[in-house]
Amino acid sequence: MTNGADALCDTLLANDIDVCFANPGTSEMHFVAALDRKPAMRCILGLFEGVVTGAADGYARMAEKPAATLLHTGPGLANGLANMHLSLIHI
């Protein structure tokens, strides 16, 4: 039976998003488990949200396709917002 985390991974893969930069916490374990079940999805661990969002931005610029990010809600998202804002600037 497909759960929401598997459906999200399937949706990402169906849209050619096959890399996820992640700084997961305990509340995201269902999605982390789903990433592990999808061999086509590459998950890259980052130890700080700024690294995760910066790496996703750099990947998208070099590969010319988006990457997914997995951050904690609240403070994790706040730590990544600066890079998310900068990713909107085309260099």
Positions of the model-derived regions?
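Thiamine diphosphate
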Residues: M1-G76, A82
